[in-house]
Amino acid sequence: MSEPIKNIVLVGRTGNGKSSTGNTLLGTKQFKSKNQAKGVTMICEMYRAAIQDGPIINVIDTPGLCDSFVPGDDISNEIINCLTMAEEGIHAVLLVLSARGRISKEEESTVNTLQCIFGSQILDYCIVVFTGGDDLEEDDQTLDDYFRAGCPEFLTKVLRLCGGRKVLFDNKSKDEKKKVEQVKQLLARVENVGEQTGGIPYTYQLHRKIKEENDERLREEERVIESKNRAEAELAEMQQNLLMEKEKLQMEEAKNKQLIAQAEANEKLMEQERAKNRAETELAAVMVEKLQMEEEKNKQLIAQANRMICARDLNIEWSHSEEHWKWVNLDHNISSNTFVEVAELLGVYWFDVSGSLDTTEMAPWTHYEVLFVVNLKDSAFKWNAAVKMNLFYINSRPGGPGTQERAVDMRQHIGKGWVTIHAGEFITTPENVGLIGFRMSEVDSGDNRGGLIVKGVLIRPIN
């Protein structure tokens, strides 16, 4: 019976000790390892070792995933080589980090690049290996002490996604017993990966994903070239059309200048003729007529003008209580550089909103209607009872106009946005002008209702 083979892939940023970790696993120096900024590993390399009382391991070292001096296409090609080397599939991926310093943004980029190349499922096969165990030992620290000093959010997430699998390595140790124990701990994590993934190595999904990404990249390059050629052709055609349009506009402009000059000359002659024929009496009549027209126009404008009473100027029961009502800035008034405040009902049993208006300032002999401007949100609740809408004259003399009252089912307005609800009408005849009041209320049902926004009251002419 042949010994089981485990394919282990090393990934990480240059300088974190990938190659040294590989040599520790193999028990002999096979991978080149130097302490320098530029990566030593430029291509994927694989070496094999038989672990005593354990499996045969194939250790595959890869280029630094975030090395700026290694082109992206080269990294993709080397990943394909890595898969070719791992014939039986990848059994574990060692994400090599250094415990000698703080985790940097480059480490986060390494994890992101790893997921982009292999897919997010690769974290199911990941084991986080921290090198620099000798430094922690000199400082009399453990790996847990290192984490307590501060663990970046992204690393916490990575450890959680890979089942918390982590191990500390001292690649400089000369203690053979310690070396064997390190490798034993790591292989235990590899076995845990197998248990969590059902013993299925990461291979077929990788081949298919990389092939699809390569094909998609080629198709994207073809689309870019095709789009560029099409854009250049469209640009050339557009430039030609613009040139022709420019010539056409220049010709029309010259023609229009001639017509304008002729029209100005004709207008000048006609004006001279009109000035000579006008008489003083006719001019006076024209001025009187103009004044009359302006006066009538101003009356119409006054009659057509709408009046808006904002929510802040209304009497809203319990509006002083933040438990029942909330004041919210809504629209921005550009002319006054202010915000329009609206009142949002959070919940109240006694619902009463009222106000008043002096009609002596309104246009005479005009028919007006009074409308509450409200918004019943989708989440409005407990509006089963009808709401009373009232319009009445305040301090009216005996025999004057009476109170107008109507009931409104507010449920029909839920979710309809801003709506106007009719409260009543009045006509500004000489005998009816004065102070009028209006009210929207419901105080009998005992329901605790909410979800209503009051913007104000609109008074406008009825055509």
Curated annotation (Swiss-Prot):
Record region (G4): 131-134
Renumbered residue ranges of the record's region G5: 170-172
Spans annotated as G3: 61-64
The keyword Nucleotide-binding appears for this protein: yes
Tissue: Expressed in radicles of the germinating seeds.
Binding site for GTP: 12-20, 33, 171
Gene Ontology MF term list: carbohydrate binding; GTP binding
Limits of the AIG1-type G domain: 3-211
Chain positions covered by the region annotation G2: 39-43
Highest rank taxon of the organism: Eukaryota
Region described as G1: spans on this chain: 12-19
Record key words, sorted: Coiled coil, GTP-binding, Nucleotide-binding
PANTHER family listed in its UniProt record: AIG1-LIKE PROTEIN_ 48352-49494-RELATED, GTPASE, IMAP FAMILY MEMBER-RELATED
Entry's family note: Belongs to the TRAFAC class TrmE-Era-EngA-EngB-Septin-like GTPase superfamily. AIG1/Toc34/Toc159-like paraseptin GTPase family. IAN subfamily.
Name this polypeptide is given: Immune-associated nucleotide-binding protein 10
Annotated source species: Arabidopsis thaliana
Lineage per the UniProt record: Eukaryota, Viridiplantae, Streptophyta, Embryophyta, Tracheophyta
Chain's gene name: IAN10
